[in-house]
Each structure stands twice: as C-alpha cells, then as structure tokens.
A protein has these predicted regions:
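Short loop segments at secondary-structure junctions
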Residues: 5, 25, 70-74, 95-96, ...
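Nudix hydrolase/Nudix homology domain
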Residues: 12, 49, 53, 57-60, ...
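Conserved Nudix-box catalytic region and its N-terminal flanking loop in Nudix hydrolases
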Residues: 1-34, 76, 82-88
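Active-site segment of metal-dependent pyrophosphate-handling enzymes
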Residues: 6-8, 15, 37, 41-76
Length: 125
C-alpha cells in the first residue's frame, strides 16, 4: 500500500497505487502497470481484473478499474517521480491487517476499501 498526503482532507491516507489513463491509446491494465511502477517501483508478473465501478454516477462518469497484482518484482529502473509522488511511503501490509483497517475506517480511500473488500470476498488475498 502507499501512504500519501491528500490536501483536500488534510491527511495522509493509505491507498492503493492509482492514476489516470493519461497516455494516448493506453488501456486500464497498461495504466495499472505503469502506475504500480511509478508509485512503488514494482513490476507485476500478472494483473487480474478485480472490480470496476463508477465513483459518483449521479454527478460524474469517472470509472475506476482495480486489478490484483501478483508475482511482484522490484524494478532495477524506476521512472522519475512526479512532485505528488515524492513523499509517498510504500509499505507491505499483511492482508488481514489491511482488511481490518478498512473495517475500522483507518483506510478512508474508497478505491483501496473497495479493492481490499473485493479481494477478500473473492478469496484472492
């Protein structure tokens, strides 16, 4: 997981790597691989589609696709970090701890909460 400061809420939040489809022609899986590398320095051997949802369908068309990354290896070459990624903390978190952190509201990122719960319900942790 990553811990990142989010100015609108004035807090550091536990999150999963995430980003935008901001490379022309890029699909969700390619973006997930790129963001994982940019934010953590890890490469995924496999990415499994986990869940996809609209964040606020009453007011936005924003769509989130979450993948479960497996067979991670630390990359020898890490892309330069953007300013927003400079203070990110990357930490391995035991899945049971992550799940309990969602249930106790310590994880407040909706993407992280939905992804962790989906992995738990699918028995993929």
């Amino acid at each position: 997981m990553i811990r990142q400061y989010r100015h609108p809420v004035g807090q550091f939040l536990w999150e999963i790597p995430a980003g935008l489809l901001d490379v022309e022609g890029e699909n969700a899986e390619s973006a997930a691989r790129r963001e994982l590398l940019e934010e953590t320095g890890y490469l995924a051997g496999t990415l499994e589609p986990l869940i996809e949802f609209f964040t606020t369908p009453g007011g936005s068309s924003e769509n989130i696709a979450i993948f479960l990354a497996r067979d991670l290896t630390l990359s020898e070459v890490r892309p330069p970090t953007e300013a927003e990624e400079a203070d990110m903390l990357v930490e391995w978190v035991d899945f049971a701890v992550a799940l309990e952190s969602v249930l106790s509201s310590d994880v407040k990122s909706p993407s992280a909460a939905v992804g962790i719960m989906a992995a738990a319900l699918r028995g993929q942790a």
